Amino acid sequence: MSELKYKRVLLKLSGEALAGENKFGIDPATVSKICHEIADVVDMGLQVALVIGGGNIFRGLSSSAKGMDRSSADYMGMLATVLNALAVQDALEKLGHPTRVLSAITMQEVCEPYIRRRAERHLEKGRVVICAAGTGNPYFTTDTAAALRGMELKCEAIIKATKVDGVYDKDPMKHDDAVLFPRLTYVETLQRKLGVMDSTAITLAMENEVPIIVCNMFKGSIKRVVCGEEVGTIVQGG
């Protein structure tokens, strides 16, 4: 068994990732594939907290631009993340991994309320913790929620798993000559506006000196990252 570099990480997934080849909704086959990647690292003893976006169901920011009240749109987006969290919970538990969904918006018939100490106890017991409903406040993205939960739960790294292999100078899905950045500082990421995470999330990680690693959600990349291999892009340092 490979030795783990980290004991506890925060894994951020976009909602769009769950849609697979579709542009909308939840694709069960894709969710299962992602959960196999997560299960591989949990089997190694890694403690995993998850934050999942809701963009495959509802994106508050784009809808507010069409005239909807921003707060209402953001709350709808938060509820979308709960749907995604329940889908991932179901898939992980089918693989034999106890999983708890903790929501920043109370809905006691569906999931537990997010309480930091409770989340930490679940992690210590080897359960996967899915933090749903963002921060529970409008105007904050799920990127910011991921950074916040990562700090609260004392995670040693934030891993952002995406459809591409890391951070590029331009969109690699559209440009064959896109160049991958193996390493970036927090300040470089902010100045270049590379879209790794939003500025609030990056600043929070920078202030608390928690590295952000951007990698492919498949190809065994998450496992390679937690074992200490230099995969994708690592954002750290001044």
Swiss-Prot record:
Name a single GO biological process.
Answer: 'de novo' CTP biosynthetic process
A single Gene Ontology MF term assigned here is: UMP kinase activity
Residues that bind ATP: 12-15, 55, 59, 162, 168, 171
What keywords appear on the UniProt entry?
Answer: ATP-binding, Cytoplasm, Kinase, Nucleotide-binding, Pyrimidine biosynthesis, Transferase
Predominant subcellular localization, coarse grouping: cytoplasm
Any idea of its EC number? 2.7.4.22
Q: What class of enzyme is it?
A: transferase
Q: Which Gene3D superfamilies match?
A: Acetylglutamate kinase-like (3.40.1160.10)
Classification via Pfam families: AA_kinase
Compartment(s) where it occurs, according to its Swiss-Prot or TrEMBL record? Cytoplasm
What does the record give as the function of this protein? Answer: Catalyzes the reversible phosphorylation of UMP to UDP.
* Subunit annotation: Homohexamer.
UniProt family annotation: Belongs to the UMP kinase family.
What is the name listed in the Swiss-Prot or TrEMBL entry for this protein? Uridylate kinase
Where does this protein come from, organism-wise? Nitratidesulfovibrio vulgaris (strain ATCC 29579 / DSM 644 / CCUG 34227 / NCIMB 8303 / VKM B-1760 / Hildenborough)
